[in-house]
């Protein structure tokens, strides 16, 4: 029988400090214990391990009334789920747009931004904003987390609040760097070349009643990848296109909530494994 046990030992959230009224920073520390018996989930053996560490430090600087800079660095150790170490989580310029027609509000993020198109993508690396140490792998697959979490490019977000409805519209276009562990997730351990994400194009819409007891959403993703083999490689040059549709829903009660995301994904690949390989 496969057993997987996760124990969260504690969470420390550091208070916000401000040396000036236009600058603030804070951080968090999370440490857990895990044990996997008869499986390779998180760990590769049956031992109890502390390979569930998350440390983050973020800051915010107000440049002007409607322009600011926000950034976060974090250290992650998730066992065998993803590459251990420090990474730049996000660093972007936030421009709050002037009042728009119809009482809409808007903002633009330029730089490395967080993915706003799925329920838990924005706060994926903030332990106290989610309810489990390991998110559902059908949507938030850990092996590809760094590329799915955010992108380098531009993102727009528009919101509208009325007496009966709350609307949110998001659009983004950019790309992410693909490290070796993510390359191995896509092409296997025998791949020795380099893989590049040409672009990732995303859009989403969310609706809530004014009571905020429900949240319904839909999102779309389209992305291209190219692989360049090394001189001594078991893979060949090729490319892949991924298109994903997600429908989501949440219900919020006073002391509990229910979340669901339904995903449909299409992949079109050419080359990669051998010259005539093609799949749709």
Regions found by a protein language model. Give the residues of each.
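Conserved positions at the start
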Residues: 153, 202, 244-246
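Outer-membrane beta-barrel biogenesis signature
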Residues: 5-12, 16-46, 115, 119
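Outer membrane beta-barrel
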Residues: 22-25, 46-176, 206-210
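Sequence/structural signature of outer-membrane beta-barrel proteins
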Residues: 32-41, 74-80, 100, 115-117, ...
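Detector for outer-membrane/organellar transmembrane beta-barrel domains
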Residues: 20-24, 32, 206-280
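Internal alpha/beta core interface subdomains
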Residues: 170-172, 179-206
